[in-house]
């Protein structure tokens, strides 16, 4: 076989012409030290803060510390087989998560990966989890109510769309129940919900998912779950994943409710990472930027103007206190960042009051401007009355010799507490709340003995649900006109008259209708 040397020569010449002397460039470093989910690496001289880095075992990490010759990396996956000398590569990307409607009804981890066994998530784009909050001129004032369905909250501490209302209290005081009821009550109200679990038990997360399924609320809810068994780095990232998903909907003009359960564990996770990275500790061993951690997270919630999308993110962060100490470091930080707080009392909860909200310490700083007129007119001085009752009730423990006026205030307070008592997973509509508040405002409950108040409340609910026109009118107009006021009054007069006849040994002459 003859060899065509000219042909070979031409092939070689063409290859030389097309050859480009380009080296495959990749920044790599070496692991110096590894332990407790923290890696110290050298050689990554151009790495960014919060950049994702890839280890040779396929796990990712995130840079949190940048020093002269080394960088501190927190692991986001398995690190057991990473050892000194292992290779680590830059990705030149920050942590980003999928966003969009494909996340509704799904349970994801802090990295945006599905963990509910329902297959891959369909999404159009990913967004970085760190973003600067909207500026002052991009925001709009809070003017629409976010209906929680909890009578005590909607009447005394109303929450507006775009507000940040803290739920604070000890363990087992009903904090999560308020958040769940708020989500259940958004059904049919075109509000998307996000629930962020931070360092919670897996059994608690499963129970929560089952509750949402039971009430058909999972279809408009996204759950970001970072359990107690996850790495501190994932507990740290979870709230930022949640708010990033919410921001995408807000930018499209939609309303979002996001709940962080809870930020106490978030602060502990960040403290753990900071101490392992050898950052200098401050008060209660928290790092110096712990306030900034929560402020930059919560400032991303709010209501934005039409030019920027016109949507809103309402945030309900939860803080767990120890022995009712709201003056501790993290509680005072978050109280100063948020637009109000609902303080849950242990002794109220143990006495059977649900929700166990302290009317004296709780406040909503911007929600009243978003309250509908029907509830605003009927709630009146309810908060003041309850605060007076709590004060007098504590004072009355010291002596039995009370004047008539004090006894009347205490009696009225007991009745109001019974009336605003509400079982979990039974949210009220705003029209029904206005009717129940009407019975307090117009002093109809004074004719009913304390022991019969809860039964009378059920009678009110049944009676007005049958008289649909009154509730429908309030729902449509969001107000109580003079004609409607008279109509409601007549209904109550007939209801009271018929109800007191069913009470044994009741003195009918006592009623002044």
From Swiss-Prot:
SUPFAM superfamilies associated with the record: C-terminal domain of alpha and beta subunits of F1 ATP synthase (SSF47917), N-terminal domain of alpha and beta subunits of F1 ATP synthase (SSF50615), P-loop containing nucleoside triphosphate hydrolases (SSF52540)
The encoding gene: atpA
Superkingdom, taxonomy of origin: Bacteria
Protein name: ATP synthase subunit alpha
Assembly with partners or alone: F-type ATPases have 2 components, CF(1) - the catalytic core - and CF(0) - the membrane proton channel. CF(1) has five subunits: alpha(3), beta(3), gamma(1), delta(1), epsilon(1). CF(0) has three main subunits: a(1), b(2) and c(9-12). The alpha and beta chains form an alternating ring which encloses part of the gamma chain. CF(1) is attached to CF(0) by a central stalk formed by the gamma and epsilon chains, while a peripheral stalk is formed by the delta and b chains.
Native organism taxonomy: Bacteria, Bacillati, Mycoplasmatota, Mycoplasmoidales, Mycoplasmoidaceae
Record InterPro entries: ATP_synth_asu-like_sf, ATP_synth_asu_C, ATP_synth_asu_C_sf, ATP_synth_F1_a_nt-bd_dom, ATP_synth_F1_asu, ATPase_a/bsu_AS, ATPase_F1/V1/A1_a/bsu_N, ATPase_F1/V1/A1_a/bsu_N_sf
Subcellular location: Cell membrane
GO MF, any single term: proton-transporting ATP synthase activity, rotational mechanism
């Amino acid at each position: 076989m003859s060899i065509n040397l000219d042909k070979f020569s031409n092939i070689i010449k063409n290859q030389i012409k097309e050859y480009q002397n380009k080296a495959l460039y990749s920044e790599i470093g070496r692991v110096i030290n590894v332990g407790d989910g923290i890696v110290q690496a050298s050689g990554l001289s151009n790495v960014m803060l919060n950049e994702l880095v890839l280890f040779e075992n396929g796990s990712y990490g995130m840079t949190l510390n940048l020093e002269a010759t080394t960088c501190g990396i927190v692991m986001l996956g398995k690190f057991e087989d990473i050892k000194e000398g292992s290779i680590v590569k830059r990705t030149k990307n920050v942590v980003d998560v999928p966003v969009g409607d494909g996340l509704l009804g799904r349970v994801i981890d802090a990295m945006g990966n599905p963990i509910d066994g329902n297959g891959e998530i369909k999404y159009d784009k990913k967004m970085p989890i760190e973003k600067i909050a909207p500026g002052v001129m991009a925001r709009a004032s809070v003017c629409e109510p976010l209906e929680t369905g909890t009578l005590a909250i909607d009447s005394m501490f109303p929450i507006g769309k775009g507000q940040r209302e803290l739920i604070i209290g000890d363990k087992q005081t009903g904090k999560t129940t308020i958040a769940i009821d708020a989500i259940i009550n958004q059904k049919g109200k075109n509000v998307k919900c996000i629930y962020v679990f931070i360092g919670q038990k897996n059994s608690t997360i499963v129970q929560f998912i089952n509750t949402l399924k039971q009430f058909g609320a999972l279809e408009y809810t996204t759950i970001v779950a970072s359990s107690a068994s996850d790495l501190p780095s994932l507990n740290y990232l979870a709230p930022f994943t949640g708010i990033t998903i919410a921001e995408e909907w807000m930018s499209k003009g939609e309303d979002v409710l996001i709940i962080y359960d809870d930020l106490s564990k978030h602060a502990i996770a960040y403290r753990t990472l900071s101490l392992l990275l050898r950052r200098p500790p401050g008060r209660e061993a928290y790092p110096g930027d712990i306030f900034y951690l929560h402020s930059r997270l919560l400032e991303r919630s709010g209501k934005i103007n039409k030019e920027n999308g016109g949507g809103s993110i309402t945030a309900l962060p939860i803080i767990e206190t120890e022995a009712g100490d709201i003056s501790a470091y993290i509680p005072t930080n978050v109280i100063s960042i948020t637009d109000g707080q609902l303080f849950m009392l242990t002794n109220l909860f143990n006495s059977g009051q649900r929700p166990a909200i302290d009317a004296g310490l709780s406040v909503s700083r911007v929600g009243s401007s978003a309250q509908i007129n029907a509830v605003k007119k009927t709630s009146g001085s309810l908060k003041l009355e309850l605060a007076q009752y709590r004060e007098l009730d504590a004072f009355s423990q010291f002596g039995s010799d009370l004047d008539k006026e004090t006894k009347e205030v205490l009696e009225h307070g007991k009745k109001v507490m019974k009336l605003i008592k509400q079982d979990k997973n039974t949210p009220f509509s705003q029209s029904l709340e206005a009717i129940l508040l009407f019975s307090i405002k117009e002093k109809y409950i004074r004719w009913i003995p304390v022991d019969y108040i809860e039964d009378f409340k059920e009678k009110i609910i049944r009676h007005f649900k049958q008289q649909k026109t009154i509730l429908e009118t309030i729902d449509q107009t969001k107000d109580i006109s003079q004609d409607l006021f008279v109509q409601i009054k007549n209904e109550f007069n007939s209801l009271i008259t018929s109800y007191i006849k069913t009470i044994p040994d009741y003195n009918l002459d006592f009623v002044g209708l």
